[in-house]
Amino acid sequence: MSYILSRKSYADMFGVTTGDKITLGDTNLLVRVEKDLTVYGEECKFGGGKVLRDGMGQASGYKSDDVLDLLITNALIIDYTGIYKADIGIKNGHIKAIGKSGNPHIMPGVHPDMIAGTVTEVIAGEGMIITAGGIDNHIHYICPQQMNEALASGITTFIGGGTGPATGTKATTCTPGAFHIEMMLKATDNIPMNIGFLGKGNTSHPEEIEEQIKAGALGLKLHEDWGTTPAAIDNCLSVAEKYDVQVCIHTDTLNESGFVESSRAAFKGRTIHTYHTEGAGGGHAPDIIVLCGDPDVLPSSTNPTKPFTVNTIDEHLDMLMVCHHLDRNIPEDVSFAESRIRGETIAAEDILHDMGALSMLSSDSQAMGRVGEVICRTWQTAHKMKEQRGLLEEDKQIDADNFRVKRYIAKYTINPAIAHGCSHVIGSVEVGKLADLVVWQPDFFGSRPELILKGGVIVQAQMGDPNASIPTPQPFFSRPMFGAMGKATGATSLAFVSAASEETVNGYGLNKKVTPVVGCRSVKKKDMKLNDFLPDIKVDAETYKVTVNGEWITCAPAKKLPLAQLYNLF
């Protein structure tokens, strides 16, 4: 006779199942479990007196090649692909299968690629949330300590440019020239993070750009501080088309060499990733935001303006002065700074994210951005939008926020991967991809990851006093783990480069796997998962009011946010 468990008892023992609702952190966001791929009564669970023992849930007689290296049991997966419960099987650093694991000799429904055997390690996923590792695709490589901070927040991939705290790097995301590209690839080789570097694209001569692509740049960056003229834009995109790499752009705030229409004309329908498309981070004032409606533009935000709060405008003026080498004693510099900070467009940016018109969210690390807050600010924005706009139409039938949550998680996982030609190996919880995974307690979702895995190996974890008798006594905080040490970093992380540079970069002697980017020139806004809305956007040049398809959009700044002082003293 079957034994009947209450939903609460089942969730306490095996984690949530189909139809259950979970609150994310201290936000107002609720998700409902869409499906459960495990088998009731045959769940795998590790521990004394539990299922994963020899001859029970753990199978005997299988070769190592036929069983999993790592099994995450009964996990709630939150991904752009869905919000569902499953076991996750990992083999050779990649996601081998997602479904029901265990011992096929005695358990029904075991996936043939999810056999738990003698060589299988286990992470208990019951009561936990699993997401893909985050991708920050607007990195100023100013200091290596950024990577420790970002990794602890759940970011596992950096894409950007720089050479350290040089004046150019503090302002622009460029790693200029073959020498610097090689040195930066070598310098980051022992850090457990997937890495990619953008070469400098500001020139009207193709040869200087081609040299950087062949040296290992995964893409190119056009920045106004180096002169983002229509000629430079056209030339850079022409070279990118030849070598199948992405171009990122910070357009001309001062409109010296042209207006937003001039840059749009220079694009000539070719794909381009527009950084901080609202404009506070830089770009044609006051209407760079209109590019969110273009089919060839992949628009992203940086996190200082997300979400719009009562402090946003004041802190931006100070940030601008420092990051762009401006002088408060020069009136023109002050005017330059003030032209970029507009409450009206910042307010509209929140709503455009909620509509799916802005496709990605990144940091702008130490250059008007906080590298450890991409994930928490994404969920703060989602919370603020639910508070101000209510349930999305797509979510009303289930009375939960599944669609909104999938839309927002796509902004820092799959969409940056697609934009930069990396989605074949990272960016989502899908079979075949590198097992870059983040494990969260629901109470701490968006703020404090419990475990971070790179290539199926734990690289960071919440850990107590190393001298204690158990792992949990205070001080309890995020610490590097074995996967972040020695040669393990190379075995579990990727160095993203252009296809044209693969042979050259293999000669650099890197430990990380050299991985060419693919499909950068064919991607369009329509390919941005759950964030492909193409509105007709206009900005009033006098009032800065933003209209979408003829309707004025705005929202009030937040006075209080979740995932903030409840979780952080400082």
Swiss-Prot record:
This protein's UniProt keywords: Cytoplasm, Hydrolase, Metal-binding, Nickel
Coiled coil: none
Highest taxon above the source species: Bacteria
Annotated residues for binding of substrate: 223
Gene Ontology MF, one: urease activity
PTM characteristics: Carboxylation allows a single lysine to coordinate two nickel ions.
Pfam families in the cross-refs: Amidohydro_1, Urease_alpha
Pathway where it operates: Nitrogen metabolism; urea degradation; CO(2) and NH(3) from urea (urease route): step 1/1
CDD domains referenced in this protein's UniProt entry, alphabetically: Urease_alpha
EC number(s) reported in the record: 3.5.1.5
Residues binding Ni(2+) 1, per UniProt: 138, 140, 221, 364
GO cellular component, one term: cytoplasm
Catalytic residues, chain numbering: 324
Modified residues (N6-carboxylysine): 221
Cofactor note (record): Binds 2 nickel ions per subunit.
Signal peptide: none
GO biological process: urea catabolic process
Cofactor or coenzyme needed: Ni cation
Annotated residues for binding of Ni(2+) 2: 221, 250, 276
Subcellular location: Cytoplasm
Family statement drawn from the similarity comment of this UniProt entry: Belongs to the metallo-dependent hydrolases superfamily. Urease alpha subunit family.
Self-association state and partner proteins as the record states: Heterotrimer of UreA (gamma), UreB (beta) and UreC (alpha) subunits. Three heterotrimers associate to form the active enzyme.
NCBIfam families named in the record: PRK13207.1, urease_alph
Protein name: Urease subunit alpha
Organism: Cytophaga hutchinsonii (strain ATCC 33406 / DSM 1761 / CIP 103989 / NBRC 15051 / NCIMB 9469 / D465)
